[in-house]
């Protein structure tokens, strides 16, 4: 473990730097490092950079005299070769070490290896200038990669087997972006402060991923540094949000603010511009319409992520939104005379779990099961106001911005000139609230006319059956989430929702708790599991697949034959459920037949006396006595459907009468 000192290049460009001619002479060795010829796409991406304004700099990114992109005076091809050589050695060396649990000191370890140009006993010879390669928290990042199902050989194959592809439209941050040839990973150069902040973030990031792997936050797979000629170039490996094989017709960078949140004229002239908040509100006033289940899962994931970012005091992050218009894509293909998609490049199955937008909110790739991605291509199905079918690719980006002194000063200065609530930079708590409200009310909206249909493998919500809307169809105000609906998305901790490791189908959406004291309901469902009680929502006649935590317990055998009469002491059971204002739940099951029914005078607790179905099958006039018992119960949580000999528990059933036989649903 070593303590890293910031290099002088972070504050000044001058220093002991090799000449650009020397670096340019060495730049052709990057492909030789990977022992492959440069792919045509890579050549195009690099030759597309130079233009009339070559030599201009944006941050540390620039263009040299030959037209090649540079970063801190280092050519892009040289940087790519050094990254591939360093990652190839460090990951291979780490895989030879036995696996173990992650310790606290593992988050602060920095391993360093020197790569002389002539080679050494540990490193191969290369055509670059001598450089040192640093790996931050190698054991911790190895755990993160394993958590997302990335094997070391797949990681090395994606990063080192093929040349990296430079993105021609990196954005205004001054960073360089590389994407692997299989669209799996993104490599981004980061500043010293961002790398330092990520190191401090790792323990909390580790805890958050353990509790909730379904997240829209960036998936960090590695943090490295190339040190050469007095320059430190730090890079981070992340998941790729926007796959290149899927054509994105629109791309948005959304923050929830309005001050200077419109794409500039220069940005709009690009072949693939990035629009902002005001552009979205102008072009899509109806928002993006999702079916109810997908909307609920997405909103919960967003709120959970906002809470995590707020706890880390992170602000100024964005939601990167890529929109693939299915109908427009089909029209474009028909205009080109294409009759089928057999000749088109189809997206291959990604190696990382939870890597696509749909998996991030549903966790559909758990337990090694492959998702049918031919139809959705990993995107979230939606429609726009014109009824066109869309696939959304989303993710939260730029989370390495903490609310430090400089950001506080920036917000204070902007607030003096403009409305402080409209500027981008703001305190983390306000920023998270504004970000979430904008996404859940303006960008994404619930449309009840959209229904989820299972795919070939029975994955609920994987495909979308869209009911076309007319071009003049107005957006109903009832589709906008109300305050009561928004309150239902309040977080109760990651473990309050079904996890992917639980028993049952792993692809089901998280169940939305009832509005009756969500924490109390979750506690009741957990506590009553030992007594075979659980919260139902739909009867088996309505659907053949019951969500987890929603079951019905039959007191008689499935074959319809009456059971033997149990002893008299077990015939009569009394279940007392007391719900106090403090959300405490007590369950008492006395064995005595003469136990009384307790009831709170304030009405905060409810008691009911239940006779088992085995006793009712032996007594004459059982339906009549059962109906009279239900009439005596003032506020029952347990009722008896008249069509079947079974009891159903519902925490929101306050009616003294059982529901009609034709309904078959609880009043949840």
UniProtKB/Swiss-Prot annotation:
Q: Which domain of life is it from?
A: Eukaryota
UniProt xrefs under SMART domains: PIPKc
Location of the region described as Mediates interaction with TLN2 in the Swiss-Prot/TrEMBL record? 641-668
Annotated Gene Ontology cellular component terms: adherens junction; cytosol; endosome membrane; focal adhesion; nucleoplasm; phagocytic cup; plasma membrane; presynapse
Mutation: residue 650 to N; reported impact is: Does not affect binding to TLN2 and localization to focal adhesions
Using the record's annotations, give every residue carrying the modification N6-acetyllysine: 265, 268
Q: Which GO terms describe its biological process?
A: actin cytoskeleton organization; adherens junction assembly; cell-cell adhesion; clathrin-dependent endocytosis; membrane organization; neutrophil chemotaxis; phagocytosis; phosphatidylinositol biosynthetic process
Q: How is it modified after translation?
A: Phosphorylation on Ser-650 negatively regulates binding to TLN2 and is strongly stimulated in mitosis. Phosphorylation on Tyr-649 is necessary for targeting to focal adhesions. Phosphorylation on Ser-650 and Tyr-649 are mutually exclusive. Phosphorylated by SYK and CSK. Tyrosine phosphorylation is enhanced by PTK2 signaling. Phosphorylated at Tyr-639 upon EGF stimulation. Some studies suggest that phosphorylation on Tyr-649 enhances binding to tailins (TLN1 and TLN2).
Q: Where is this region: Disordered?
A: 45-67, 526-578, 593-642
Give the Low complexity compositional bias ranges. Answer: 526-535
Say what the protein does.
Catalyzes the phosphorylation of phosphatidylinositol 4-phosphate (PtdIns(4)P/PI4P) to form phosphatidylinositol 4,5-bisphosphate (PtdIns(4,5)P2/PIP2), a lipid second messenger that regulates several cellular processes such as signal transduction, vesicle trafficking, actin cytoskeleton dynamics, cell adhesion, and cell motility. PtdIns(4,5)P2 can directly act as a second messenger or can be utilized as a precursor to generate other second messengers: inositol 1,4,5-trisphosphate (IP3), diacylglycerol (DAG) or phosphatidylinositol-3,4,5-trisphosphate (PtdIns(3,4,5)P3/PIP3).
| UniProt name for this protein | Phosphatidylinositol 4-phosphate 5-kinase type-1 gamma
